[in-house]
């Protein structure tokens, strides 16, 4: 992944309005339009563009975040040959309709329903952290740091973490040898 226009996408995000409760997924109902749209975007990237650099898929309404590891989508959706066949038929115009709503209601809904109880994800609500912003104690800071780490590019793009406490700082080591 790099920062050019032609580079592969590493993160897919579907953002819903806070007032659009009918389309936003919930812990009780994952099979809603937000996840159906994520599935379509994922299949377009993975099947059509051969992009295997996707790391996470996120559905959010700015307060609630549902973060899916791309490995879950790979196992539950991409490896499902029947779904890939139906998706390709949809893309190639061999289905009754080529409208995205058709994909959501006739294809995505069926396959999400099959895996919704076993689909793993991380969930949190930013409003649950609001009260921590005014506190100055270390436990509040730790919780906010954990949240910050989730949103970091290192985490979201699964970049290697360079600050290993067991590794030597090359500049410090060279200076130490010089002394």
Residue ranges and their predicted role:
Residues 1-179:
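Charged, often flexible domain-edge or linker segments that flank or initiate folded functional domains
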């Amino acid at each position: 992944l790099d920062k050019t226009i032609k580079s592969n996408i590493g993160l897919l995000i579907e953002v819903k309005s806070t007032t659009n409760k009918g389309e936003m997924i919930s812990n009780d109902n994952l099979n809603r339009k937000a996840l159906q749209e994520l599935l379509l975007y994922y299949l377009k990237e993975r099947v059509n563009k051969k992009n295997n650099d996707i790391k996470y898929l996120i559905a959010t309404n700015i307060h609630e975040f549902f973060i899916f590891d791309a490995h879950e989508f790979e196992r539950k959706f991409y490896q499902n040959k029947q779904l890939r066949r139906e998706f390709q038929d949809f893309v190639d115009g061999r289905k009754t309709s080529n409208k995205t709503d058709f994909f959501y209601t006739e294809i995505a809904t069926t396959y999400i329903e099959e895996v919704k109880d076993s689909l793993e994800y991380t969930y949190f609500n930013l409003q649950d952290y609001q009260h921590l912003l005014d506190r100055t104690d270390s436990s509040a800071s730790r919780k906010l740091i954990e949240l910050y780490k989730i949103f970091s590019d290192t985490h979201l793009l699964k970049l290697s973490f360079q600050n290993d406490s067991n590794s030597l700082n090359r500049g410090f080591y060279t200076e130490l040898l010089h002394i």
